[in-house]
């Protein structure tokens, strides 16, 4: 059942990406396309994880899940900034990208060190594979990264609404609610 869910999610994400791509000739929001690409990678990696036969395959799939998970918030933040006409400086983008790569490096250490996961095994008892992991000392860094991105998105949306910038209030309101 889980494999069917992940397959359906992957197929739908590819369809939505193709729809966005075909509409993209009139839009200039490359970060939204990158966000959709991250969703496709995540869904494909979750499907691969559910089908993994051993720990090495599961860890490889998990690395792709984190590849998408680390960069999706960055692309969503830049999409929000583009839609609301908020300029992110090149320096801020560089710093955020470097931080993302550092966190990505940490998420790739399972199987080599115990920084991110102290121990990893797989469980296939329910007809699909899932990782059974004991979190290491650096696992909270990823959660903090996600929290900071969500907080930044909320602040940018709220600031755009309250400063009455030249942006679509429909976009800002919908983004703030969601």
Outline where the language-model segments fall.
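Interfacial "cap-and-anchor" motif at the non-cytosolic start of specific transmembrane alpha-helices
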Residues: 2-10, 44-46, 159-178
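Inter-domain helical "communication" segments and dimerization helices
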Residues: 14, 85, 90, 151-154, ...
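Juxtamembrane membrane-water interface segments that cap and precede transmembrane helices
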Residues: 121-138
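Membrane-embedded alpha-helical hairpins and interfacial helices in multi-pass inner-membrane proteins
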Residues: 119, 144-155
């Amino acid at each position: 059942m889980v494999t069917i869910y992940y397959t359906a999610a992957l197929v739908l994400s590819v369809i939505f990406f193709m729809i966005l791509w075909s509409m993209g000739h009139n839009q200039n929001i490359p970060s939204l396309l990158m966000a959709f690409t991250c969703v496709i990678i995540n869904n494909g990696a979750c499907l691969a994880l559910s089908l993994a036969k051993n720990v090495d395959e599961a860890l490889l799939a998990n690395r792709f899940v984190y590849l998408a998970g680390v960069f999706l918030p960055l692309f969503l933040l830049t999409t929000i900034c583009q839609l609301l006409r908020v300029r992110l400086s090149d320096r801020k983008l560089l710093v955020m990208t470097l931080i993302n790569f550092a966190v990505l490096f940490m998420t790739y250490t399972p199987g080599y060190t115990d920084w991110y996961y102290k121990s990893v095994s797989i469980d296939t008892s329910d007809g699909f594979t899932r990782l059974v992991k004991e979190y290491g000392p650096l696992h909270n860094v990823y959660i903090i990264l996600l929290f900071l991105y969500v907080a930044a998105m909320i602040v940018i949306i709220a600031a755009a609404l309250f400063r009455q910038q030249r942006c679509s209030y429909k976009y800002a309101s919908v983004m703030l609610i969601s």
